[in-house]
Amino acid sequence: VHPERIAHENDARVKRLTGKIDAVLVDAPCTGSGTLRRNPDLKWRMSPAAVDELVAKQSAILASAARLPKPGGRLVYGTCSLLPEENEGVVDRFIAAHPGWTLLSAPEILARQGVESIGDGRYLKLLPHVHGTDGFFGAVLERPAA
């Protein structure tokens, strides 16, 4: 394992690593709505315009990160948001714009690793009122094989 931390989509290493990585984790900047129970003041700073701006940034980061996995490699997209616009919306638009990419079932992948089933269908979803944690979203995407 050789971890690489790439802080932004314009990092010079992106070109060198394109198509060579087994797995990429995108910890996308988000509203943090999944942390409202610990940070209740967030609700006063969120606006539709701020969410739209973050969704555009998340989409750009995900598209840029999609260049990195090798054929058959995986891309994990995660946020600490509960907003569908930042989660399923970003992933759905990515899948529509990138033919061949497959959305895998995160709960099934975790179950094969012995982790209790957590999620809703194909996504990993931690909900504060259900799991007693901050809210979290995760999606596992697989690049088409060569």
PLM regions with names:
Residues V1-A146:
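S-adenosylmethionine
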